[in-house]
Structures are given as structure tokens and as C-alpha cells.
Amino acid sequence: MSEDNSQGRDYTLESDSELRFEIEQKDVKVLVTLVNGFAELFGTELVKKKKYEFGMGAKVAIFTYQGCVLHVQGKMDVCYVSKETPMVQYVNCHAALEQFRQEAEEKDACGPVAMVVGPMDVGKSTLCRILLNYAVRVGRRPLYADIDVGQGAIAIPGNVATILIERPASIEEGFPKTAPLVYHFGHKSPSGNSVLYNAVVSKMAEVTLNSLSGNKRTQSSGIIVNTCGWVKGSGYAHLLHAARAYGAKAIFVLDQERLYNELLRDVPPNVHVVLLPKSGGVVERSKELRHESRDQRIKEYFYGNIRAPFYPFSFEVKFQDLRLYKIGAPPLPDSCMPIGMKAEDNKTKVVAVTPTQSLLHHILALSFAENTDDDVIGTNVAGFCCVTNVDMDRQAVMLLSPQPRPLPPNALLLWSELQFMDNHA
């Protein structure tokens, strides 16, 4: 039900309740001000008397433990106050993780790795944000690992990534995405190349776990891992693989009892598996909306947003100067493979790509690997560019890039199935 608060309206929230609203229309903004009391958005505290602006696509749930008054101005598609909220259970999860962190601190050991799992559209990314914010608010510096290649909470979709969280997320923009550790996968779902997906998850887990020992505060703070919404069949096998790779101490299962019971059966008994309800404010997204969300993430990578716009560069690169590869060769039966190789080895093979018109609109990852003799899969990426034109007559491509020309020396580019139509004026 649409609600027009053009003149502004005050909402009085009782303790342990939340104001939820959604904005679906373009060119609409909603301003929210905390008038009195205490309130938070996904674990980040609102500052009293400060105006917060939300635009199209916003799905907001402002929660209060003690009660508050919020002033809201603008047109929303949905707006209501709810007392039915799982926030108390979520803060209990934070308290349990904090206990593990204190034990790790005393023993000079690594803090807990907590995985958040569940089907699509149950609020996994939101729970990760809440747990990370609560950790930072008590002085921790956790790592945030995102292995959901479909949406991309840290890097653009089609990649796995990790960042260090040192301060609470901004109310309007989330966590700063500075200096992420990013590994190229190149597909929208782990099903695009299951062998490669497990390989990049294992590599990122190895690197991040090793990095914990470099800083005592981060070491005891541990890691929060956000996962894909594919939880059946091979998707479930990927979850088990990630739990082993990271040595998960806790697995928080959102809104699916079947998955909870399967994990109880299959993970070691020292792993704490906890079933949690999803929030009533979680919105189920259509395929079209998920596609739009992916496009928006890629657009923000190149162009930023209204508050912090970026101005990318376009430049031409000749085919002869393009060192372009993809990971994964077409499948062959075992009988056709060289002696000692299996068919699945082809899934991680680095194959040269000949530029053709089919490259148009594809995302390319710029690897830190300098040649294919390096461990390309196990080498992180520096950034991304997009093919905006392919000129077969001139044997050249036009690239959209955050950095000006030229490409770095020995630049090795990795093909991704992700595409972006650059319609930016």
C-alpha cells in the first residue's frame, strides 16, 4: 500500500519494534530523521536530528531496542511499524560470537568464522551487516567474506571477495569497499563452473585465514561469511566445502529447517548450527529484479552514485595488445584427456580467447598474474573493465575502465559471462 508523507509524519516506535518501508519508484527520495530515543539500521546507530536520504530500491527496517520517534518525509510504496522482528535473536548470535572472540583473545588464537546460509531472499546479507556492525561497535575488526557470486556485496557479481571492517556501515551506502581482496570466478552462479568455484573459495579462505595472524585485533575478531542462496544438491555441497575451507565455528541458517537438519547431520559436532527466523520485512525478488540489482552493482563500480560519482575512462586497445583468457575449457570425456588428467581438470584450464563480436558488453577482470604460467586462479584481481565496442575492421576493442589508458604492462584479462550495457549519458 502506497503511503505519501510529502509533508512529513512522526512515527512513535515502542521498544523492540521497527519501522519498515520500501521505495520502488524512480526519482523519489525519502528523508528520515531520528527525533528522539535510540534507533539503528541493520546494526548502525542513527544520529539524532540528522537527515538520512533513501532512494529507489531501498528496503529499510529501522529498529529500536528502547523506543524512539522517527520523522519520515516522502512517498513510499510500503510503510508500516512491526513488533514482529527477529532482532533479539540476531543480537544473541552476536553475543555468542563475542564470547568465542574473548576466548580466542585469551588463548592468542583465531576468532570464530561464522557462515550465514539460507535460500534466496531470506536476508543473509542483512544479517551479515548486522553481525559486522555489532562487532565493530564493541571494538572488533572482523573480516567480511562474500562468496555469493550472484549479487556481489563487496566486488561486482561474478567474483568472491573479502574486506576488513573497521567502522560501522554508513546508513545510506553500507560498508566502504576500499582495498578488497577479490578473486575472479566469471559466472553468475557456482553452477557455471563448480570445480572453479570450489577452487577460488578455497584459495580465498586460505589467504584470509593466514592473514589473521598478522594483526591481533583482527585475529580474535574472526570472519563473517556471506553465501549463495543455492542450498540444494550441488549448492549444498558448495556450502559444506566452504564450511570446511574456512573451518567454520558457527553456521546461522535462515528460514529453512531442512537445511538446518542436513547441516546438523553433515558438519562436525564442534560446529554450532543455529536456526534463525527471517525478518518479516524481507522482500522476495523476481529474476528481473535480481538482474537489475546485478546491473546496478556493476554500474556503481564504474560510475559511483549520486553522493560520490565516478568518471570512468574509455580507450581503444588493439587485438594484438589484448592478452585475453578464460578459465575453463569445453568438457571432454576422460578417454580423450592426456594421460594422468581428468575431465574436471579442464574446468580450471586457462584458455586463450580470440576477440570477436561476441565480446561486446562483457566484463573483463584485470589479474595480478603476469602470465599463464602463474597461478591465475589463485591470483587476485586488480579491477574490472567492460567491452563497449568491438571493431573487427580496425581489429580493436573499446574498453570502459576506472583507470585511464594504457592498460598496465603485461596486463592479463580474464573473460566473464557477466555483461553490462553502458547506457550512461
UniProtKB/Swiss-Prot annotation:
GO-annotated biological processes: mRNA 3'-end processing; tRNA splicing, via endonucleolytic cleavage and ligation
Pfam families: Clp1 (PF06807), CLP1_N (PF16573), CLP1_P (PF16575)
Compartmental location: Nucleus
Residues given in the record as ATP binding sites: 18, 59, 121-126
InterPro entries: Clp1, Clp1/Grc3, Clp1_C, Clp1_C_sf, Clp1_N, Clp1_N_sf, CLP1_P, P-loop_NTPase
GO CC terms of this entry: mRNA cleavage factor complex; tRNA-intron endonuclease complex
Superkingdom in the source lineage: Eukaryota
Entries under SUPFAM superfamilies matching the protein: P-loop containing nucleoside triphosphate hydrolases
GO molecular function, one term: ATP binding
Swiss-Prot/TrEMBL keywords: ATP-binding, mRNA processing, Nucleotide-binding, Nucleus
Sequence similarity: Belongs to the Clp1 family. Clp1 subfamily.
Stored HAMAP family: Clp1 (MF_03035)
Function: Required for endonucleolytic cleavage during polyadenylation-dependent pre-mRNA 3'-end formation.
PANTHER family found in the cross-reference section: CLEAVAGE/POLYADENYLATION FACTOR IA SUBUNIT CLP1P (PTHR12755), POLYRIBONUCLEOTIDE 5'-HYDROXYL-KINASE CLP1 (PTHR12755:SF6)
Protein name (record): Protein CLP1 homolog
Gene name of the record: cbc
